[in-house]
Amino acid sequence: FSGFIKEKFSKRVQNIYIVEMIILATCAFAINLLAGSKTLEVLTGIPFTYTAIAMAAIALLYSFRTGLKATVITEMFKIIVVWTGVILIVPAVIYIAGGWETVQAGLGGMRGDGASIIGTERAWVVFATFGAAAFLGHLGGPWGDNSFYQRAFAIQKKSVFKSFVIAAFIFGIIPIMMGLLGYIGAGSGMEIPGNMVGTTNAIVIANFLPAWASLFFVFLVFAGLVAILDSQFSSIANMTGHDIYNKYKKKVDDKTVIKYARVGMVVLAIAGFLITQIPGITLLYIFLFFATLRAAVWLPSLIAIVKPKLLSEQGMFYGMGIAIIIGVPMFVYGKLAKSLPYTLSGTLVAIFGSVVLVLAISKWNKKQIS
């Protein structure tokens, strides 16, 4: 996709996309590595550092060999395994925990007031600090993630739209079903430490089901998250072996291309692992950061595909650049300082400020030319 941006606009606009997509790939790799290793630590007692190394190494080894083909196979395997877990584990937990009444009792969350906060100050805080970035980040996700463009280009043109719609429904049910385990935890009165909230499902399963269920969940998590890791390896290999390679090398040499791609994979593995070792790092902070970043290119990318004549090179470069440089740091500061105004403002500037600036500068630029 960045190649399309280069041809349509310029190299410097392409650079914005490459930097954004590399940061996103690194964060996506890190969050899944952290989620998997932390879950395995809870269920097995093995320090998460060791499991993180193992997960990254396994995904790296077979990605070196087969690349994008491996991601197709592992994604298919992942969806089968995860759906098996949804069908077997979730109903079993609900039944043993006391049935649907326990789920209903947990709808209000640990405090019991979650279902009644609409219209209150607390609802505004939840929306400003989490809801806005999470919702908009998910909407804009595919537009700022190189792995989605890879999948689109790997599918026959006539099947792209249908494939993405069907895939969304197949996967969309999974987080809804797995989310019921969180309500079970709240409804049954389980006390889960704040630093372990990200592994709630694993704790709930271990609390209500026998050891075999936890072992299967370990396998499910490992298989599912390793599949995501290899997707990011494939994504970064595409960028380093194609986009970055083509910037500095005019002659295409297959061996050198593969070398660039593999170096990119290794660097991604190291960077992602180092992020997981940051003291106090949480899944939530990583997710919200890259959700805001990738959503900043969402609307400009959509317009560039559908109505490219509305945009100019300067509009794309300065519009997205200014919005990202101002909005993302503002959002990060707001999260670290626990400042609601900064958090919400950063989200809005990065996402909506981006498209407003892109269109405004493009319009001004075209007037100057005419």
Which residues does each predicted region cover?
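Membrane-embedded helix-loop-helix hairpins and adjacent transmembrane boundary segments
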Residues: 1-370
